[in-house]
Every structure is written in structure tokens, then in C-alpha cells.
Amino acid sequence: MRNIKITLDYDGSKYKGWQKQNQKGSNVSTVQDKLEKVLTKMTSEEIQLIGCGRTDSGVHAKNYVANFKTNSLMTLEQIIEYINEYLPEDIRVTEIREASERFHARFNVKSKTYEYTIDNNKFKDVFLRKYAWHVEEKLDLEAMEEGAKYLLGTHDFKSFTSLKSKNKSTLRTINSIEFHENNNILSIKINGNGFLLNMVRIMVGTLVDVGLGKIEPKYINDILEAKERAKASEKAPAHGLCLLELNY
């Protein structure tokens, strides 16, 4: 049996995230569901697609990685052409490879990079409205960079997740947080070994509050130590977030 690795981009605007919903009678549209239906039709097999991780409803992805097992004898070129012909325009497979039998898109990930985009112009950019959070008030980038330093390293990020399970570890490592600003469009790239539910969006929401002067940069350390979701800020909107890169 072959193990096929695919890399894809998707605009998450119309989807309820990556992962398919298993409720009976559910008509929820997800990226995984769209792909599995095309692959099942192509191979006449019940394909189960393994994704590199979940993305929230409305979140986008570039270079998302998934894999699936198949007995199909189609060439890689035939497979990618078929998939892209039948997928909607907001999902596109960009690369396909034969993977080792043991390759697992989720469990083999060493780190992930997310990018969050903020439109900090007074008036919303029409062409970025689906891909950037419009924050009209001018942000203090220096304060945000100072606050971000407290998030670097290994911490218990319980304050920065919507996850309510008491059995799951909330310990994660943030390797880097980079800020890039150009014409009032701010990009925040966050690399870590893994992320909890809503973690990046809550981190960004908190950093924006620092940038607006609502909280001091050093208060982020207090938020981490509190281990209480209520201490952190509201999560940033989903549409500004994009899963950007994976390291295996």
C-alpha cells in the first residue's frame, strides 16, 4: 500500500476548519471533507486523510501537509491533476510525493509557523478584508515586541487556550515571534513546537491590547503565571490567521 504525502493551500473563509465533523446528518463544510470525497471518488476506496493539525473555522493555510494510504496505481501526476480538477477553487494541492510507510503528517511535525496579519490603517483595506484583522487605532509595535519576549521559551500556556480538558498538557515551547510592518500592514510570525486550541489567536489578541496601551508588556508574564483563561485578552478574529510553514 502506498503512503501519499500532499501539500496544499486553502482559503478557510467558507470552511468550518480543517477537520471533518462526525455528527450524523451534519452538513458542515470542512477542508478535510472536501478532499476525502474527491480522493474516495478517484480511488474507489474509503480514503482517510491525516492532516498535520486542526485549524479553526475561518483560518487559512499555506503549505498544509496531509497524507493518505491507497492501493491506487495512478501516477503522482495523474493524482494531483485529478484532485485539483475536482476541488473547489479555494483549495489547491501544490505538491505530491510518495512518503515512507511510517510517515504521519501530524505526529512527525517538529514545529509549526503561523502568521497573523493586522491591517493597522485608519480605513480598512478592501483587498485584505478577508485575510487581515483591521485595527484602526495605531499600535505601539515596540511595546508589542517587548511583550512578546515573555511568551518565548517553554511555558504552561493554560491562560492562552480555550481548551477546558484537565487531562491534556498545556505545556508548549515558542521558538520565535517575529514582527514585520510595511505600510501599516503588520505581520506577526509565531513558531513553536505545537499550539493549543485558539492559542495563537489569544496570544495575538493579548499583544494587540499591549499595542493599544490597555495592558503593560510585563503583564504578559503575570497572565502566564495565573494559568487562567480570563486573565488573557479576547482572541483575535480567525480570518487574520494563516498556518504558514511546517518543519518535519
Curated annotation (Swiss-Prot):
An MF annotation (GO) of this entry: RNA binding
Top-level division of the source organism's lineage: Bacteria
Keywords for the protein's UniProt record, in alphabetical order: Isomerase, tRNA processing
Annotated active site: 56
Annotated substrate binding sites: 114
Short name of one Pfam family: PseudoU_synth_1
Gene3D superfamilies: Pseudouridine synthase I, catalytic domain, C-terminal subdomain, Pseudouridine synthase I, catalytic domain, N-terminal subdomain
Catalytic activity entry: uridine(38/39/40) in tRNA = pseudouridine(38/39/40) in tRNA
InterPro entries assigned: PsdUridine_synth_cat_dom_sf, PsdUridine_synth_TruA, PsdUridine_synth_TruA_a/b_dom, PsdUridine_synth_TruA_C, TruA/RsuA/RluB/E/F_N
E.C. number: 5.4.99.12
SUPFAM superfamilies: Pseudouridine synthase
A Gene Ontology BP annotation from the UniProt entry: tRNA pseudouridine synthesis
Record bears the keyword tRNA processing: yes
Known function: Formation of pseudouridine at positions 38, 39 and 40 in the anticodon stem and loop of transfer RNAs.
Family statement drawn from the similarity comment of this UniProt entry: Belongs to the tRNA pseudouridine synthase TruA family.
PANTHER family registered for this protein in UniProt: PSEUDOURIDYLATE SYNTHASE (PTHR11142), TRNA PSEUDOURIDINE SYNTHASE A 2 (PTHR11142:SF22)
Oligomer and partners: Homodimer.
Name this polypeptide is given: tRNA pseudouridine synthase A 1
Organism encoding this protein: Clostridium perfringens (strain 13 / Type A)
Lineage, top ranks: Bacteria, Bacillati, Bacillota, Clostridia, Eubacteriales
